[in-house]
C-alpha cells in the first residue's frame, strides 16, 4: 500500500482504508442480493429492485476506487493551513446514486413527473455545490455550503409534503411505507452537511473520521434503505396488483396509469369494415358527407368512440 505524506497533510491512514474495503464489500454483496431477489419477481414488479440494485452497484464501484487509493486529490484547507485529502469519487457516486434513491421513493409515491423533476434537480445541484465547496480554497466555500443546504431543504419539503400527498392518494399500505421511508431518508440526509461542515468545511476532524462518518451514512442510506425496500416488496406488489385490477394501472412516475390496458383510450381508424364484421365486431357507421365513421368500444368502465 502506497504511503501518503502526513506532515502538513490531512490524509487517510490504515483505519480509513479498512473502512473503505469493508464498505465496498457490503455494497457489492447487497448489489448481488438485491438483483437476485429482483429477478425472482415478474417483470412488472421489478422497477424498485432494479433501481435499488443499481444504487449499491454504483456505490460499490466508487468505494473500490477510494479503497484502492484513487479518486482523491489534495486541496489547501483555509482552516488549519494544511493540505486536506478530498475524495471527488465520493461526489461522482452521489451525483448518480442520490437521484436514484429519490427515484425509488418517488416511484413508490407515484408522484407527478413535474414534482419528481424539481426534487431530483435540487439534489443534483446540492451534490455539485458540495464538490465545488470541497475543492474551494477560499472562504467562499461556505457560500457553496449554504446554497447546498438550501437545496437539501427543497428536497426535504418535496419529500415530506408534495410527494407525500401523492402517496396518500394511493392509499392502502403504500402511504405508510412511503411515510416511514421518506422520514428515514430525509432525517438521514441531513447528516451529510454536518459531516461536510466538520471535514471539507472547517477541517476539524481527521480524514479517517470523515471516511468513517460518510461510510456510515452511505451504508444507512443505500444498504439499509435498500433492504427496507426489499422488505416492503409484498406490500408494494399487492398494492400494484390491486390498482391494476381496478383499472388504474401500475402507478408510474411518468403517468399513474400508463401500464394499464384498461385505462388507455386509443383512437385508430378502421380501414376495412367488412373485415370487422367477419370477426364478429360491430361495423362502422358512415359519417356525414361520406366520411369514415366510428365504432363504440368498451375501455374499462368507460365507453369511448374510436
Region locations from a protein language model:
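Polytopic alpha-helical membrane-helix bundles and their juxtamembrane interface segments
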Residues: 1-92, 97-306
Amino acid at each position: 500500500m502506497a504511503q501518503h505524506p502526513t506532515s502538513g497533510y490531512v490524509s487517510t491512514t490504515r483505519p480509513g482504508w479498512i473502512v473503505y474495503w469493508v464498505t465496498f464489500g457490503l455494497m457489492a454483496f447487497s448489489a448481488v442480493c438485491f438483483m437476485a431477489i429482483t429477478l425472482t419477481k415478474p417483470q412488472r414488479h421489478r422497477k424498485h429492485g432494479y433501481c435499488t440494485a443499481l444504487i449499491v452497484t454504483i456505490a460499490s464501484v466508487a468505494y473500490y476506487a477510494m479503497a484502492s487509493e484513487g479518486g482523491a486529490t489534495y486541496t489547501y484547507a483555509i482552516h488549519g493551513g494544511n493540505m486536506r485529502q478530498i475524495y471527488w469519487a465520493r461526489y461522482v457516486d452521489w451525483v448518480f446514486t442520490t437521484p436514484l434513491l429519490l427515484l425509488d421513493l418517488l416511484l413508490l409515491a407515484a408522484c407527478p413527473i413535474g414534482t419528481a423533476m424539481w426534487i431530483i434537480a435540487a439534489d443534483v445541484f446540492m451534490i455539485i455545490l458540495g464538490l465545488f465547496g470541497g475543492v474551494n480554497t477560499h472562504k467562499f466555500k461556505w457560500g457553496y455550503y449554504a446554497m447546498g443546504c438550501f437545496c437539501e431543504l427543497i428536497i426535504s419539503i418535496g419529500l415530506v409534503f408534495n410527494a407525500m400527498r401523492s402517496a396518500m392518494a394511493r392509499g392502502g399500505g403504500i402511504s405508510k411505507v412511503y411515510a416511514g421511508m421518506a422520514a428515514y431518508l430525509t432525517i438521514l440526509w441531513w447528516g451529510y452537511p454536518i459531516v461536510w461542515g466538520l471535514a471539507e468545511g472547517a477541517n476539524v476532524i481527521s480524514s479517517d473520521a470523515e471516511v468513517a462518518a460518510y461510510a456510515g451514512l452511505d451504508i444507512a442510506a443505500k444498504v439499509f434503505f435498500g433492504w427496507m425496500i426489499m422488505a416492503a416488496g409484498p406490500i408494494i406488489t399487492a398494492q400494484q396488483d390491486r390498482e391494476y385490477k381496478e383499472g388504474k394501472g401500475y402507478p408510474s412516475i411518468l403517468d399513474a396509469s400508463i401500464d394499464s390496458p384498461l385505462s388507455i383510450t386509443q383512437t385508430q381508424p378502421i380501414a376495412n369494415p367488412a373485415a370487422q364484421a367477419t370477426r364478429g365486431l360491430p361495423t362502422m357507421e358512415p359519417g356525414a358527407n361520406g366520411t369514415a365513421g366510428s365504432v363504440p368500444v368498451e375501455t374499462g368502465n368507460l365507453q369511448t368512440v374510436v
